[in-house]
């Protein structure tokens, strides 16, 4: 072996295989690009992005760790989302959850606290 050398095994690696996935259409209605990282709670993404936030609750982009998706102004993209795993807790970000994703206080038919579909900025 040569110092620093690495050897790859034949075949491919499937990221996020077996995870429940859904597709959502996203439109950037803002005047600036928006970039969302791989593990960001998608429902809390920039309000300039128009999409079904309720459906995206508890989900992240189905892309490799450390990567991101970029939405230019006016862009319309379809992205795949998967459920957040682990302890399923979200803290910070846009402060919409700040705790466990499951067992929240949402009422049937009502948006979850902090996850409103309307844009709240100018």
Curated annotation (Swiss-Prot):
Could you tell me where this protein is found in the cell? Cytoplasm
The pathway to which it is assigned is: Nitrogen metabolism; urea degradation; CO(2) and NH(3) from urea (urease route): step 1/1
Looking at the record, which segments are called Disordered? 102-122
Catalysis: reaction(s): urea + 2 H2O + H(+) = hydrogencarbonate + 2 NH4(+)
Keywords assigned by UniProt?
Cytoplasm, Hydrolase
Pfam families documented for this protein: Urease_beta
Q: Does the keyword Cytoplasm belong to this entry?
A: yes
Sequence similarity: Belongs to the urease beta subunit family.
Q: Which NCBIfam families is this protein grouped with?
A: PRK13203.1, urease_beta
**What is the annotated quaternary arrangement, including any partners?**
Heterotrimer of UreA (gamma), UreB (beta) and UreC (alpha) subunits. Three heterotrimers associate to form the active enzyme.
Q: What is this protein called?
A: Urease subunit beta
Naturally occurring in which organism (per UniProt): Paenarthrobacter aurescens (strain TC1)
Gene designation per UniProt: ureB
């Amino acid at each position: 072996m040569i110092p620093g050398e690495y050897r790859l095994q034949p075949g491919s690696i499937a990221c996020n295989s077996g995870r429940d996935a859904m597709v959502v259409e996203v439109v950037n209605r803002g005047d600036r690009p928006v970039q969302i990282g791989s593990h960001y709670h998608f429902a809390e993404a920039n309000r300039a992005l128009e999409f079904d936030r309720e459906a995206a609750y508890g989900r992240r982009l189905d892309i490799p760790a450390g990567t991101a998706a970029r939405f230019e102004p006016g862009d319309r993209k379809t992205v795949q989302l998967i459920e957040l795993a682990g302890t399923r807790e979200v803290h910070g970000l846009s402060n919409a959850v700040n705790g466990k994703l499951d067992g929240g206080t949402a009422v049937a038919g009502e948006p979850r606290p902090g996850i409103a579909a309307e844009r709240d900025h100018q």
